[in-house]
């Protein structure tokens, strides 16, 4: 946890939380409880988190509003953090009963001004009866009033912290099983699945590509401690079809596409499901290439129609042909997909790339176009030319109401952010599109925010020029970068 490897850890995975963890360096459960109470708008806006961290780390002395409050506030280094501490402070200083203290708690939580004024009088009088001077009593109540804007229930924070600790424990000691469960819980959210798979890679966990022979409905860990892909996470695949497929596979394995067509009701999935499985590579284990799998889909569906319409069907789907005849053999000469097409199809079916990166497809052609890979950047790099795939863009306005564009791009080695000022953006906006490979040139500097987020040195670029990569490649290589997919010309069935 102190190393901020908290992706998928309950409540602890946001960049801001990671930054607070780095500063606080929690060493015990109570500090995790405090961490969760501090990371909320009220404490963050008031600067309470800074005070807490500085006291914990010995940069600021730990003091208490009154010596009677040391047992109440020692756990939080003299900072009033929880509603329960306010209740106990009122009891210790002003003689409140538990019932009266709860009235004070509710008045704070609901910000009841009249009730708080009434409580001030009760509190100050109680403190005076306890030999505490009126001025000090009012100062302490002022602290309590300030706390009313951001007070949190300790029991809630403790419950969250317990879940945080449990998930961190599971991630540490049962990483494969924990990450498989996290992936299964993220089904339907391709961005989340993509980020978790990247985290698995960083952890040394191998997430396998979809496989019709081994993948389950959900993600799971195989005997080799690899994570098998959950087929219900594929885009465009009918969930009922995946469950049917899984049931059929328990009875018999699939030897090839013909065998698959004979044993599975392909009509239940339809064309869209079969295309998604093919593009994701799920048929790779029973078919020579993904292009062949895609070419076979119309015939697979035709056989499904025959099977569904034959009310007297009771046996081999191809019982009227020779046993060694495979009607899909006619597609064996279909050209395989090139690397770029393969990756594009993966993104269609999965929502991300799993077997490589588009920049890899042109790495030989761009070796003279770029000065660095992203992973090559270091403290001595003042400027660089990077070829990267645009992942996302966002804009803010400067003081003159002109756009400043932030672009995130990556290559086969890593990712980084670029800052594009308005003049350059106006000139190049037409090519700055997601999923486009561009050549970025600019000055390089440390990205403090992302460095804190990742606990490693990250860089960003102040972009000075942008070009479309295809304009720098020979025409014969442009097909590798085309946005649309190449259509297959397939032989007709005899």
Positions of predicted regions on the chain:
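A short, hydrophobic C-terminal helix/tail in secreted or cell-surface proteins
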Residues: 489-494
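Noncatalytic, beta-rich nucleic-acid-contacting surfaces in large DNA/RNA-processing enzymes
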Residues: 1-488
